[in-house]
UniProtKB/Swiss-Prot annotation:
Keywords: Cytoplasm, Exonuclease, Hydrolase, Nuclease. This is Exodeoxyribonuclease 7 large subunit. InterPro entries: Exonuc_VII_L (IPR003753), Exonuc_VII_lsu_C (IPR020579), OB-fold_nuc-bd_dom (IPR025824). GO terms for molecular function: exodeoxyribonuclease VII activity; nucleic acid binding. Pfam families: Exonuc_VII_L (PF02601), tRNA_anti_2 (PF13742). The keyword Hydrolase applies. The keyword Oxidoreductase does not apply.
């Protein structure tokens, strides 16, 4: 008897297609660890090999577009970790996997751990920009957390000595590789924060493999960097090496040398600042002197146009006050300049650029001497012009006119007499001579007749 419902009947092609779709849709991408065997690479550039363990094996294919991203040459017997899609080769019904990426087994497992920790810390917000602390500018003391025998420490110290030899450096030596390294790095970061001697920390090491750099992918190290009150610059490996510490740090430097560049100031730049300050000082002094000279010239011109002795005295008092203010301002300017020079000299002495400092001091002495000479010359010229102005004013004074035999006669109302018609007989007059006054009475008035010229 036939059953009530006939079972589905597959062709071989349909069966293989159905199995392939089930494998691809249900399994998706998987990670597989195994040993390589039967590795071949035909002219097409694709890789064909078998992955096996102690009890089973599976055929694998890795096409050229994928295998060219692999950084090593697979070898027979090598343990690898692959990311692949499971499929079925329909023409032969062979079950196989299509490999998308491949890593040595050890590095592959570490890479998985790296990605998992990165995702975890990122979800907690440890990488957020809002938590990044600004670096001090300039840094007054730098702490270095690295191996005391590694090339990274040598590179950092070399750059700091070249750029800013006066910058203090405190080294917190620690292991940077091995099982004990993460704990030592954490303790060094905590110690630096407890002692609070530095205002920036460089945490890092030289280049190496993923295993060599793994201490800086440790969760304990990442959380210690995040918790540090002192800004941290990560400097792990080479520019292509990126660790968890780089994401958590306040700033990532591609190399230890680059980290030293970031936290230090350039000595040559400091020297350029000194030269620029000196030039601005010279310009300010020249402008100040020119402005005061112009002001003095204006005052002197006004004095020449105004005669009374009282005004002259007031102008002289104002001039003296201006001179005192100018002297006081110049003294303060020189004092501030001297203080700034002393600070810069102390800074430069610590950096030991003695020849340039000596030349700068010589130049400043010359400028001080030149300023003193200019002030003496200006004051001497001012006194001479003032004396000439007084002599000129005395020469045109009415008192000088009286001394030459002239007199001034005024009526009883105080008006100066210029014509005879201003007085009458019997009026009293007052005459001013050089040495006193004469009072007189008008007896007779005799006008002088003006002669008329004939016109031809």
């Amino acid at each position: 008897m036939l059953p009530s419902q006939s079972p589905a009947i597959f062709t071989v092609s349909r069966l293989n297609q159905t199995v392939r779709l089930l494998l691809e849709h249900e399994m998706g991408q998987v990670w597989i660890s195994g040993e390589i065997s039967n590795f071949t690479q035909p002219a097409s550039g694709h890789w064909y090999f078998t992955l096996k363990d102690d009890t089973a094996q599976v055929r694998c294919a890795m096409f050229r577009n994928s295998n060219r991203r692999v950084t090593f040459r697979p070898q027979h017997g090598q343990q690898v970790l692959v990311r692949a899609n499971i499929t079925l080769y329909e023409p032969r019904g062979d079950y196989q996997i299509i490999v998308e990426s491949m890593q040595p087994a050890g590095e592959g497992l570490l890479q998985q751990k790296y990605e998992q920790l990165k995702a975890k810390l990122q979800a907690e917000g440890l990488f957020d920009q809002q938590y990044k602390k600004p670096l001090p500018s300039p840094a007054h003391c730098v702490g270095v957390i690295t191996s005391k025998t590694g090339a990274a420490l040598h590179d950092i110290l070399h750059v700091l000595k070249r750029r800013d030899p006066s910058l203090p450096v405190i080294i917190y030596p620690t292991a940077v590789q091995g099982d004990d390294a993460p704990g030592q790095i954490v303790r060094a970061i905590e110690l630096a924060n407890q002692r609070n001697e530095c205002d920036v920390l460089i945490v890092g090491r030289g280049g190496g493999s993923l295993e060599d750099l793994w201490s800086f992918n440790d969760e304990r190290v990442a959380r210690a960097i995040f918790a540090s009150r002192i800004p941290v610059v990560s400097a792990v490996g080479h520019e292509t090496d990126v660790t968890i510490a780089d994401f958590v740090a306040d700033l990532r430097a591609p190399t230890p040398s680059a980290a030293a560049e970031v936290v230090s100031r350039n000595q040559q730049e400091l020297l350029r600042q000194v030269q620029s300050t000196r030039q601005r000082l010279e310009m300010a002094m020249d402008y100040y002197l020119a402005n005061r000279t112009r002001r003095f010239t204006q005052i002197h011109h006004r004095l020449q146009q105004q005669h009374p002795q009282l005004r002259l005295a007031r102008q002289q008092t104002m001039l003296e006050r201006l001179q005192k203010r100018m002297s006081f301002a110049l003294e303060n300017q020189l004092k501030r300049t001297g203080q700034q020079q002393q600070r810069l000299t102390q800074r430069l002495n610590q950096q030991n650029p003695q020849p340039k400092i000596h030349r700068a001091q010589t130049r400043i002495q010359q400028l001080e001497y030149r300023l003193a000479e200019i002030l003496r010359a200006q004051l001497s010229a001012t006194r001479e012009r003032f004396g000439n102005a007084v002599t000129h004013l005395e020469a045109v004074s009415p008192l000088s006119t009286l001394a030459r035999g002239y007199s001034v006669t005024t009526a009883t109302d105080g008006n100066v007499l210029k014509k005879v018609k201003q007085v009458k007989a019997g009026e009293m007059l007052t005459t001013r001579l050089e040495d006193g006054w004469i009072e007189s009475e008008v007896k007779n008035i005799q006008p002088v007749k003006k002669s008329r010229k004939k016109v031809h």
